C-alpha cells in the first residue's frame, strides 16, 4: 500500500504551444483525461488532470520483497513490469468514460529509440490517444516557472542518474548525463565526487560552446532539482567549485512531474487535441 503523497505546488501556467484557431467553432465536449508521468529509477510520480499529484511511490513492479525495479539509471529495462507498476498506481483514478488519455512522459536527455520504444510498450495498456515526451531537464524548468528567455543551466540529480543541460530559448541546446545520483552517495561515492562530475561536465560544455550562452547561464546560476537538491552537501560543493549561485528548485523531487503537467495543460488547449467524439464508443 502506498502512502498518500503530500500536497505539491500546482504546475505554473505556460504559453500555448501553438496559436489557437479562432475561425472555427469547436463542439463542446468533455476533454480526454490527461496524465503526466515521471518514471524515475527510484520513484514514480503521476499527475492527473483535475486531481493533481495522485502517486509518488517507489519504482518497483510490486510491493513487498518480490518486487523488482523496472527502471535503472533512467532507462526502462522491464516495460511489462513498468506497466504493472503504473496500472497499480492508477487503479481507481482514471474515469470510466472510455475516453483515451493524453499522456506526457518525462524522458532522460539524449535517450534513443530503444528508450522510446520501451516507453511506448509501457503505456500501451492505457490505450493513450496521444503520448508526448519532454526532456526531464526542460520539465524541471517549466515546473519551477523559470525564466526561459535567458540561457539557463539545469542540473537534475536523480537517484541513479544526473542530467546537466543548457536551455536556450526554452529548448535544450546542449546536454550530458552521468550514471551517478543521490542514491549512490555513501561509501566511496561522496557528495564532493558527485559535484566534481557535474563540474567536469559543465567545464566541458564551456569549452565546446562557441557562443557565450553557457557562460551567461553559469553567471546566472544553476537550477538544481531532483533528490540531490535536498542534500545541503551537494549544493555546497557545487556552489564552491563552480563559484556561482546554486538554486534548489521548490519541492525539487517533484519539479519534473509538475513541469510535465504544465506542458500537458498547454497541449490540451490546442485544437488538435480537442475531445474526440468517438472516444466514448471505443
List each model region and its residues.
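Basic (Lys/Arg-enriched) interaction patch that binds polyanionic ligands
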Residues: 151-157, 161-167
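Nucleotide/phosphate-binding catalytic cleft detector across ATP-hydrolyzing
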Residues: 1-154, 171-222, 226-282
Amino acid at each position: 500500500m502506498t502512502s498518500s503523497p503530500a500536497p505539491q505546488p500546482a504546475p505554473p501556467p505556460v504559453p500555448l504551444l501553438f496559436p489557437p484557431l479562432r475561425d472555427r467553432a469547436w463542439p463542446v465536449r468533455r476533454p480526454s483525461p490527461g496524465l503526466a508521468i515521471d518514471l524515475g529509477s527510484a520513484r514514480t510520480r503521476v499527475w492527473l488532470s483535475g486531481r493533481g499529484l495522485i502517486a509518488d511511490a517507489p519504482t518497483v513492479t510490486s510491493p513487498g520483497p518480490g518486487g523488482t525495479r523496472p527502471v535503472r539509471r533512467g532507462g526502462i529495462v522491464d516495460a511489462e513490469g513498468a506497466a504493472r507498476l503504473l496500472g497499480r498506481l492508477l487503479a481507481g483514478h482514471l474515469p470510466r468514460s472510455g475516453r483515451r488519455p493524453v499522456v506526457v512522459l518525462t524522458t532522460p536527455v539524449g535517450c534513443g529509440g530503444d528508450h522510446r520504444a520501451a516507453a511506448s510498450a509501457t503505456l500501451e495498456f492505457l490505450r493513450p490517444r496521444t503520448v508526448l515526451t519532454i526532456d526531464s531537464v526542460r520539465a524541471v524548468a517549466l515546473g519551477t516557472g523559470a525564466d526561459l528567455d535567458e540561457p539557463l543551466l539545469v542540473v537534475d540529480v536523480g537517484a541513479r542518474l544526473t542530467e546537466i543541460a543548457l536551455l536556450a530559448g526554452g529548448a535544450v541546446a546542449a546536454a550530458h548525463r552521468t550514471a551517478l545520483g543521490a542514491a549512490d552517495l555513501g561509501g566511496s561515492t561522496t557528495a564532493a565526487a558527485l559535484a566534481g562530475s557535474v563540474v567536469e561536465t559543465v567545464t566541458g560544455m564551456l569549452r565546446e560552446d562557441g557562443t557565450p550562452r553557457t557562460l551567461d547561464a553559469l553567471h546566472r546560476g544553476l537550477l538544481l532539482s531532483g533528490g540531490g537538491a535536498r542534500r545541503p552537501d551537494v549544493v555546497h560543493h557545487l556552489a564552491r567549485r563552480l563559484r556561482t549561485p546554486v538554486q534548489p528548485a521548490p519541492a525539487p523531487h517533484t519539479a519534473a512531474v509538475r513541469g510535465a503537467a504544465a506542458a500537458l495543460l498547454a497541449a490540451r488547449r490546442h485544437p488538435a487535441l480537442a475531445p474526440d467524439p468517438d472516444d466514448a464508443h471505443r
